[in-house]
C-alpha cells in the first residue's frame, strides 16, 4: 500500500514537471499565419494550439468536423 502511494506521488510530480515544461515552451515566439495576426488552436484551450501562440490571442472557434474542433486566434 505504501509502495503504491509512493509510486503514485512520483508519477503526479513527474506529470506536473512535464506540464510546466510544455507551458514554458508555449511562451516562446510563435509562427504566425499569413496575415501575421492569426494562429490555429484547439477549442478546449487557447494553450493547446499548433504553434504555441494562441495563449496570447483571442479564440474565435469554428467546427470543421466533430472530432477536430479548432479555433482561429486573432490578436486584437
Swiss-Prot record:
Disulfide bonds join 39-54, 46-59, 53-73, 61-71. Residues 1-15 form the signal peptide. Residues 16-36 form a propeptide. The keyword Disulfide bond applies. Its main location: secreted. Keywords: Disulfide bond, Knottin, Secreted, Signal. The keyword Heme does not apply. GO terms for cellular component: extracellular region. Expressed by the venom gland. It is found in: Secreted. Belongs to the neurotoxin 02 (plectoxin) family. 09 subfamily. The presence of a 'disulfide through disulfide knot' structurally defines this protein as a knottin. This is U10-ctenitoxin-Pn1a.
Amino acid at each position: 500500500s505504501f509502495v503504491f502511494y509512493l509510486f503514485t506521488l512520483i508519477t503526479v510530480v513527474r506529470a506536473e514537471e512535464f506540464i510546466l515544461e510544455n507551458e514554458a515552451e508555449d511562451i516562446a515566439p510563435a509562427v504566425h499565419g499569413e496575415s501575421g495576426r492569426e494562429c490555429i488552436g484547439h477549442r478546449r484551450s487557447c494553450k493547446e494550439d499548433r504553434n504555441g501562440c494562441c495563449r496570447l490571442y483571442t479564440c474565435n472557434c469554428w467546427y470543421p468536423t466533430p472530432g477536430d474542433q479548432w479555433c482561429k486566434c486573432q490578436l486584437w
